């Protein structure tokens, strides 16, 4: 009797690339041959190209998120949205998630440790601090010229524009939004800038220009990337209600950057400066921004929401789940809700993690 493990290797290589990334663990358990093939090469490229796959933090839990992006004229741009909690991490409450070249870095909610995870290989690694972690710590992840994974901790002196303080990993370096002062007509003005941290030299590079210049403290800024090929920046002006712009790099080096406008909308709702994580799809000219639903002023229940923004003022909100009510910080203050946080679109990696070995990677402090 022929079994599935008896299939010729060329047939198996036709089957495996069609498997969704989130189903690989089940596929690997079928037989040793399938397990070996899936860990020696990335087999999900076909599926990844046809759908968005990312990871989102909801209710302090890590979830996988996937959906298909469509370009049907007059129809919905997003189809088959699926969000599932990651079983291997269901015992860990997470307050932050960062992505670098197929690896994810999590900060635990109690700030007791960091967790690095390779979703494709199914490997995790716990990192204990050399000094106690603190709730105000900020983190970035990258690698040096020898592909050694490194974590940057505490760069709070480099003030972030707005409240979105997360860095984005791009080709091994980390890029963060920051602010600088410039003198104009005998007055100091605040400008938004981009800084890069080189994990080989362990130094910040020169200031890089953003496409908007001066800004108000209430403006929303957020960084993302496209498969670690291009950086993307989102800006929503506090002064112009509903206006949102997204720019994408057409050139980026350690000392120079140039931008092209990707999308502009005047129909978008106001996104909180405490939220605004997002991703884009170039082929379909669409952006998806994550926040809570619009505040109505009196309700005690709000939903975590994906806002889909497209060409010709296409705008749609999609409810992705009820937001936990975290209570009031003060008696007459409004309720605080847990906001969704998404990392950039995920690309599988064959980089193994050093499991159960002492942590020898350098922890950088500034």
Curated annotation (Swiss-Prot):
Pfam families: F-box, FBA_1. InterPro entries: A_thaliana_F-box (IPR050233), F-box-assoc_dom_typ1 (IPR006527), F-box-assoc_interact_dom (IPR017451), F-box-like_dom_sf (IPR036047), F-box_dom (IPR001810). Residues 1-51 form the F-box domain. Coiled coil: none annotated. CDD domains: F-box_AtFBW1-like. PANTHER family: F-BOX ASSOCIATED DOMAIN-CONTAINING PROTEIN, OS09G0372900 PROTEIN-RELATED. This is Putative F-box protein At3g13624. It comes from Arabidopsis thaliana.
């Amino acid at each position: 009797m022929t079994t599935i493990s008896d299939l010729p290797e060329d047939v198996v290589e036709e089957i495996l690339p069609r498997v969704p990334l989130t189903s690989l663990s089940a596929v690997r358990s079928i037989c040793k041959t399938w397990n070996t093939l899936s860990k020696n090469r990335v087999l999900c490229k076909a599926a990844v190209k046809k759908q968005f796959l990312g990871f989102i933090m909801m209710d302090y839990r890590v979830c996988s998120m996937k959906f298909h992006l469509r370009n049907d004229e007059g129809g919905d741009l997003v189809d088959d949205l699926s969000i599932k909690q990651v079983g291997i991490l269901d015992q860990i409450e997470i307050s932050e998630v960062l992505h670098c070249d197929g690896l994810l870095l999590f900060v635990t909610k109690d700030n007791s440790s960091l967790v690095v995870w390779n979703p494709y290989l199914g490997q995790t690694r716990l990192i204990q601090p050399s000094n106690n972690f603190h709730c105000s710590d900020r983190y970035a992840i990258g690698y040096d010229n020898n592909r050694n994974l490194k974590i940057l901790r505490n760069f709070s002196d480099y003030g972030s524009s707005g409240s979105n303080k997360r860095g984005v990993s791009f080709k091994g370096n980390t890029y963060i939004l920051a602010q600088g002062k410039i003198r104009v007509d005998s007055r100091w003005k605040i400008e938004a800038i981009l800084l890069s941290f080189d994990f080989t030299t362990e130094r910040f590079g020169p200031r890089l220009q953003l496409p908007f210049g001066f800004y108000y403290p209430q403006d929303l800024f957020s960084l993302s990337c496209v498969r670690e090929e291009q950086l993307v920046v989102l800006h929503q002006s506090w002064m112009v209600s509903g206006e949102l712009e997204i720019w994408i790099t057409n050139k980026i080096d350690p000392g120079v950057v140039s931008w092209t406008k990707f999308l502009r909308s005047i129909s978008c709702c106001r996104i909180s400066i405490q939220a605004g994580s997002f991703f884009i799809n170039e082929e379909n000219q669409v952006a998806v921004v994550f926040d809570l639903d619009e505040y109505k002023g009196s309700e005690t229940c709000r939903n975590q929401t994906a806002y889909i923004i497209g060409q010709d003022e296409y705008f749609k909100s999609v409810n992705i789940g009820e937001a936990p009510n975290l209570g009031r910080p003060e008696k007459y203050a409004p309720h605080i809700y847990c906001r969704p946080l998404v990392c950039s679109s995920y690309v599988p990696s064959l980089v193994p993690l050093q499991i159960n070995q002492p942590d020898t990677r350098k922890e950088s402090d500034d």
